[in-house]
Amino acid sequence: MLVQPWMSCQALAEVRKLVGTYKDEEVSITVTGHSLGAALATLSAFDIAENGYNCTASATFPVTAFAFASPRVGGASFKQRLDTAAAAGLRVLRVLNSGDIVPRYPALPYHDVGVELVIDTSASPYLKAPGDENVWHNLECYLHGVAGAPTASGEGFEHVVERDVALVNKSYDALKEEHGVPAAWWVPWNRGMVKGDDGRWSLLDCEDEDDREDALVSPVNK
C-alpha cells in the first residue's frame, strides 16, 4: 500500500524473504516514519499483518508501527480492519505533539487508529516559547519530547533519555539562545558549492561518494 504498487510489492517481498531467513529466531518487524512517512508506515505495517507476511508455518511475528506526527489515513472501515489485524500481531503507536495540527487532519470521516501517545514539547525548558507550527511538527522536536518526561511534580520537563539537545536545531531555530547552538546548522559545507580554479562557484558533481564527502568537509575540519 505504498505510493506505487510495485513499491509495495518490492517491500513486501523483502519482508517475506527476511522472515523466511530468520524464521527459527525471535523476530519482530518494526516500521516507522514521520508525517506522510508515518502514514505510509501505518499502511505498510497493516499490509504486512493483514496479508500474513509476518507469519510462518509455526509462528506469527509481531508487527509494530511507530508513527510520528502522522495524518489520519483511513475511515471507519479501515480502523475496524486495523483493529482486527491486532489478532495477526499488529500494533500501531501514534506519537503526536499537542501543538501539532497535522495529526488532526484529514477531518471526519477519517479516524485515528492505534494507540495514541501525546507529548507536549511546550513544557520543555530547552525550547523557545511558545514555538510555532514548524517546530511542533519537526521530527527532532518530537524526538526531544519523547526523550523527556514530566517531573515528579508534573509541572516541568526533564530528560530521561540521553539525547543531545543540539539536534533540535538541525533544521529550525527552536532552542533557547542560552544553549549556544546555531539555527538550522545541518547543511552541507557551502551547500555543495565549490570554487573552481577559475574563481567561479559551481555545484559539486561527484560520481564517487568518497570524493563527495571529502569535498563537503569544512577546510577547518580537514
Q: Where in the sequence are the language-model features?
A:
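Serine hydrolase/lipase
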Residues: 1-32, 42, 46-222
